[in-house]
């Protein structure tokens, strides 16, 4: 029972952080593009496209984070098939978007962006159904003072730091790539 109390508190705090972080990025998307892809900012078409792509696809990060959380719960219950199958949903969604939706868009890349977002919702929906079937769907509460949360944060901080260094490197690559001419070898 204690582990489920922790999972519910973790789910609540995780949802809160994901929601507010996603909301902030969506609201400041042009600033976000200026910081992380400055080369796009001074080309009106590229800037508008980048802002639109960010606003359409950024929620996918929150959705896939919840899918990863669900996968962890399922793995602890010896259920490995669905977490392994989940990326296939993403691929199928993008293929369908590219083949069937792209021709109906003036700028076909929008179809792929919407395909990414739809894939995230489908992945999460399938995971929610699977967790309900095994009676392990967390019921998020917002108990930020749960003793397990502080212990969890202390244990996960080194992993976040290590992963963050890799992400910073990728962001720097993106900044430099955005400054190159279209079609430049990278």
Predicted regions and their residues:
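Membrane-embedded alpha-helical bundles of multi-pass transporters/translocases
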Residues: 1-186
